[in-house]
Amino acid sequence: MSEVTKNSLEKILPQLKCHFTWNLFKEESVSRDLEDRVCNQIEFLNTEFKATMYNLLAYIKHLDGNNEAALECLRQAEELIQQEHADQAEIRSLVTWGNYVWVYYHLGRLSDAQIYVDKVKQTCKKFSNPYSIEYSELDCEEGWTQLKCGRNERAKVCFEKALEEKPNNPEFSSGLAIAMYHLDNNPEKQFSTDVLKQAIELSPDNQYVKVLLGLKLQKMNKEAEGEQFVEEALEKAPCQTDVLRSAAKFYRRKGDLDKAIELFQRVLESTPNNGYLYHQIGCCYKAKVRQMQNTGESEASGNKEMIEALKQYAMDYSNKALEKGLNPLNAYSDCAEFLETECYQTPFNKEVPDAEKQQSHQRYCNLQKYNGKSEDTAVQHGLEGLSISKKSTDKEEIKDQPQNVSENLLPQNAPNYWYLQGLIHKQNGDLLQAAKCYEKELGRLLRDAPSGIGSIFLSASELEDGSEEMGQGAVSSSPRELLSNSEQLN
């Protein structure tokens, strides 16, 4: 194929709606355990969702440099779409075909790439668009993919867009509910139970969403009501691994640790190589030890041996988790009840990819805020996550200016900028400079007060600049909202 045709192909590639244009991973950095989780879902998910996972697996294989394996995954996806969505096969295949074009392009097989370009073009022409169309099923496909990659905010947008066209679609509604549930770990993005209840109403057989509703109600101190949904889901889907795993989390948080261990072990029967599950069981045994110690049972004559046995179980399962290739950062990141230093500080000292470390610092920051823990610690981990993001694009600049991390990451009109600066100076032992920064933050907050008290803390020029600054910055004013928009800053 001629060079001209290659150039024309390169103009088409960015127009294709597929994994290569969805910005799934920052700098194409994939967490190490994602491929295992995707493969696990291919094995145990219902057939109609497997094509979505095969497409994602194809992209992961490409990022690993294994394009031949990527092509095999795309063939599997194409076959499944033909089987499960025969009436919509062409539209449902657009994402797969787009992925084909990109993989063949990277392999230098331009004639094969052109074959799939023509397939996309023929389908999209029916909708008066050459290479991409707006279609709710495609938004849903992207939504599930973004959700699997941990990009919950983007997934939420995709499902909301799909629901605009088909507001009563059960799959779209379930996707939105799941995305919003995962966003609920961020204290600024908590949501009501309505979206979960609506998803259950539209899809009453979706037992996984029922368990998520139970977990949400538990978080709202409505544990008894939540347990009814969990019990119903377990009764109707006693072997569904995502239901069992989430139900186990419910009982772990309830303190019914024996029930939690039983459910986690049932999941292990289907996924014996899942290190995360071994870790969860180990955490449950640790919690059982603490339960006995807190109630004074450890002093009883026969209980000392039991406690030692529980400690050994905890150690055995933890070691088993590591043997199975557990990524410590992902294991610890969703255990809000294990925020103690012994469980949470260890992974940050591990040698792991920046993409995983950055994600975990941000999750830890959110958990500290959500649970009302140390504000200084929340800011510290928020800065660590932002710093990792900055280093990945400009490593030398950060290396040369280690003391000015926050200034490089946040503009002065960012919400609570001076409060953040104050905390940094405080942590560095410069209390005088910290006090000056806190004064500036107070001045910002009080700038528009009728009494003019803001002038005590700000210079005349800073007061004059204030109106423009406030217009550009977010409306956040609480110190606890300091890092609420960190995803946008990364």
Swiss-Prot record:
Region (Disordered) location: 386-409, 467-490
Classification via InterPro entries: TPR-like_helical_dom_sf (IPR011990), TPR_rpt (IPR019734)
Pfam families: TPR_7 (PF13176), TPR_8 (PF13181)
SMART domains linked to this entry: TPR
TPR repeats: 51-84, 94-127, 136-169, 172-206, 207-240, 241-274, 415-448, 450-481
UniProtKB keywords: Antiviral defense, Cytoplasm, Immunity, Innate immunity, Mitochondrion, Phosphoprotein, Repeat, TPR repeat
Compositional bias per record (Basic and acidic residues), positions renumbered to this chain: 391-400
GO biological process, one term: innate immune response
Modified residues (Phosphoserine): S203, S478
Superkingdom, taxonomy of origin: Eukaryota
Subunit details: Component of an interferon-dependent multiprotein complex, at least composed of IFIT1, IFIT2 and IFIT3. Interacts with IFIT1 and IFIT2. Interacts (via N-terminus) with MAVS, TBK1, TRAF6 and RIGI. Interacts with COPS5.
Role, per record: IFN-induced antiviral protein which acts as an inhibitor of cellular as well as viral processes, cell migration, proliferation, signaling, and viral replication. Enhances MAVS-mediated host antiviral responses by serving as an adapter bridging TBK1 to MAVS which leads to the activation of TBK1 and phosphorylation of IRF3 and phosphorylated IRF3 translocates into nucleus to promote antiviral gene transcription. Exhibits an antiproliferative activity via the up-regulation of cell cycle negative regulators CDKN1A/p21 and CDKN1B/p27.
Family statement: Belongs to the IFIT family.
Name listed for the protein in its UniProt record: Interferon-induced protein with tetratricopeptide repeats 3
Naturally occurring in which organism (per UniProt): Pan troglodytes (Chimpanzee)
Chain's gene name: IFIT3
